[in-house]
A protein has these predicted regions:
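Acidic, PIN/NYN-like endoribonuclease modules and their adjacent C-terminal/linker elements
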Residues: 1, 108, 113-141
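Short, well-structured N-terminal submotif of metal-dependent ribonuclease cores
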Residues: 1-38, 52-68, 140-141
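Short secondary-structure boundary/capping segments
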Residues: 2, 26-30, 71-72, 80, ...
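A secondary-structure boundary/capping signal
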Residues: 7-8, 42, 122
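A generic structural signal for short hydrophobic patches within well-formed alpha-helices
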Residues: 11, 43-46, 88, 126
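Short, flexible helix/strand-to-coil boundary loops that buttress conserved ligand/catalytic motifs
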Residues: 15-18, 50, 95, 130
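General small-molecule cofactor/ligand-binding pocket signal
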Residues: 37, 81, 134
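Active-site neighborhoods of divalent-metal-dependent phosphate/nucleic-acid chemistry enzymes
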Residues: 48-51, 74-121
Length: 141
Protein backbone atom coordinates (compact mmCIF):
# COMPACT_ATOMS: atom_id res chain seq x y z
CA UNK A 1 0.00 0.00 0.00
CA UNK A 2 1.26 3.47 -0.88
CA UNK A 3 0.73 6.72 0.96
CA UNK A 4 0.22 10.03 -0.82
CA UNK A 5 0.03 13.68 0.12
CA UNK A 6 -2.49 15.31 -2.21
CA UNK A 7 -1.54 18.77 -3.39
CA UNK A 8 -4.36 21.32 -3.46
CA UNK A 9 -4.60 21.14 -7.25
CA UNK A 10 -5.19 17.38 -6.99
CA UNK A 11 -7.83 17.71 -4.27
CA UNK A 12 -9.55 20.38 -6.36
CA UNK A 13 -9.62 18.10 -9.41
CA UNK A 14 -11.50 15.45 -7.41
CA UNK A 15 -14.27 18.01 -6.93
CA UNK A 16 -15.07 17.98 -10.65
CA UNK A 17 -17.59 15.14 -10.56
CA UNK A 18 -18.34 14.12 -14.14
CA UNK A 19 -15.63 16.47 -15.46
CA UNK A 20 -12.54 15.06 -13.77
CA UNK A 21 -9.54 14.61 -16.06
CA UNK A 22 -9.62 10.96 -17.30
CA UNK A 23 -6.03 10.22 -16.22
CA UNK A 24 -6.67 11.61 -12.73
CA UNK A 25 -9.86 9.56 -12.49
CA UNK A 26 -7.95 6.39 -13.46
CA UNK A 27 -5.17 7.22 -10.99
CA UNK A 28 -7.69 7.84 -8.20
CA UNK A 29 -9.47 4.52 -8.84
CA UNK A 30 -6.15 2.65 -9.06
CA UNK A 31 -5.18 3.93 -5.61
CA UNK A 32 -8.52 3.64 -3.79
CA UNK A 33 -7.03 1.37 -1.11
CA UNK A 34 -3.99 3.59 -0.56
CA UNK A 35 -3.60 6.23 2.12
CA UNK A 36 -4.45 9.75 0.97
CA UNK A 37 -3.42 12.68 3.17
CA UNK A 38 -3.60 16.46 2.86
CA UNK A 39 -1.66 19.28 4.47
CA UNK A 40 -3.37 21.94 6.56
CA UNK A 41 -2.19 24.27 3.78
CA UNK A 42 -4.81 22.80 1.42
CA UNK A 43 -7.84 24.14 3.35
CA UNK A 44 -5.97 27.45 3.62
CA UNK A 45 -5.57 27.62 -0.16
CA UNK A 46 -9.17 26.59 -0.81
CA UNK A 47 -10.54 29.15 1.66
CA UNK A 48 -8.32 31.81 0.11
CA UNK A 49 -9.87 30.92 -3.26
CA UNK A 50 -13.34 31.31 -1.76
CA UNK A 51 -12.51 34.84 -0.62
CA UNK A 52 -10.86 35.79 -3.92
CA UNK A 53 -13.78 34.63 -6.09
CA UNK A 54 -16.61 35.78 -3.81
CA UNK A 55 -16.87 39.27 -5.34
CA UNK A 56 -17.04 38.00 -8.95
CA UNK A 57 -19.06 34.83 -8.44
CA UNK A 58 -20.76 34.56 -5.04
CA UNK A 59 -22.63 31.38 -6.01
CA UNK A 60 -19.44 29.52 -6.93
CA UNK A 61 -17.72 30.88 -3.80
CA UNK A 62 -20.55 29.52 -1.65
CA UNK A 63 -20.38 26.12 -3.40
CA UNK A 64 -16.62 25.97 -2.94
CA UNK A 65 -16.88 26.88 0.74
CA UNK A 66 -19.63 24.32 1.26
CA UNK A 67 -17.46 21.65 -0.39
CA UNK A 68 -14.56 22.60 1.91
CA UNK A 69 -16.65 22.55 5.08
CA UNK A 70 -18.87 19.55 4.33
CA UNK A 71 -16.61 17.27 2.27
CA UNK A 72 -12.91 18.09 2.63
CA UNK A 73 -12.64 18.94 6.33
CA UNK A 74 -14.68 15.97 7.60
CA UNK A 75 -13.33 13.63 4.91
CA UNK A 76 -9.71 14.34 5.84
CA UNK A 77 -10.31 15.00 9.53
CA UNK A 78 -7.96 12.19 10.58
CA UNK A 79 -5.71 12.45 7.52
CA UNK A 80 -4.69 16.11 7.67
CA UNK A 81 -1.08 16.85 8.57
CA UNK A 82 -0.07 19.96 10.47
CA UNK A 83 3.14 21.94 10.44
CA UNK A 84 5.61 20.96 13.14
CA UNK A 85 9.16 22.19 13.62
CA UNK A 86 10.67 19.54 11.31
CA UNK A 87 8.26 20.53 8.55
CA UNK A 88 8.93 24.23 9.10
CA UNK A 89 12.70 23.78 8.90
CA UNK A 90 12.44 21.63 5.76
CA UNK A 91 10.11 24.23 4.21
CA UNK A 92 12.67 26.94 4.93
CA UNK A 93 15.24 24.97 2.93
CA UNK A 94 12.85 24.49 0.00
CA UNK A 95 11.99 28.19 0.05
CA UNK A 96 15.59 29.43 0.27
CA UNK A 97 17.37 26.92 -1.94
CA UNK A 98 14.71 25.92 -4.46
CA UNK A 99 12.64 29.12 -4.55
CA UNK A 100 9.32 27.43 -3.84
CA UNK A 101 6.39 29.59 -2.76
CA UNK A 102 5.59 29.58 0.96
CA UNK A 103 2.60 27.26 0.48
CA UNK A 104 4.43 24.89 -1.89
CA UNK A 105 7.39 24.83 0.51
CA UNK A 106 5.11 23.74 3.36
CA UNK A 107 3.27 21.14 1.28
CA UNK A 108 6.51 19.73 -0.11
CA UNK A 109 8.13 19.66 3.33
CA UNK A 110 5.10 17.86 4.76
CA UNK A 111 5.45 15.15 2.11
CA UNK A 112 9.19 14.82 2.75
CA UNK A 113 9.01 14.75 6.55
CA UNK A 114 6.21 12.15 6.57
CA UNK A 115 7.69 9.98 3.80
CA UNK A 116 4.73 10.52 1.48
CA UNK A 117 4.62 10.73 -2.30
CA UNK A 118 3.34 14.13 -3.37
CA UNK A 119 0.50 13.85 -5.91
CA UNK A 120 0.51 17.08 -7.90
CA UNK A 121 0.04 18.43 -11.39
CA UNK A 122 2.88 20.85 -10.69
CA UNK A 123 5.61 18.22 -10.38
CA UNK A 124 8.15 20.41 -12.20
CA UNK A 125 7.94 22.90 -9.31
CA UNK A 126 9.12 20.22 -6.88
CA UNK A 127 11.53 18.25 -9.11
CA UNK A 128 14.78 19.66 -7.70
CA UNK A 129 13.77 18.97 -4.08
CA UNK A 130 14.10 15.19 -4.26
CA UNK A 131 10.57 14.69 -2.96
CA UNK A 132 8.89 11.54 -4.27
CA UNK A 133 6.40 12.76 -6.88
CA UNK A 134 3.54 11.49 -8.98
CA UNK A 135 1.56 13.47 -11.54
CA UNK A 136 -1.94 11.96 -11.74
CA UNK A 137 -2.57 13.91 -14.97
CA UNK A 138 0.12 11.79 -16.63
CA UNK A 139 -1.16 8.47 -15.30
CA UNK A 140 -1.86 5.61 -17.71
CA UNK A 141 -2.70 1.99 -17.06
Amino acid sequence: MKAFLLDTVTVSEFRKIGRIHPAVDQWQHRHLGDEMWISVVTPLEIRKGVHLVRQKDPVFAAELDEWLINIILPGFQHRMLGIDISTALQAAEYRAIHGLSPNDSLIGATAKVHGLTLATRNSADFQATGIQLVNPWEYSL
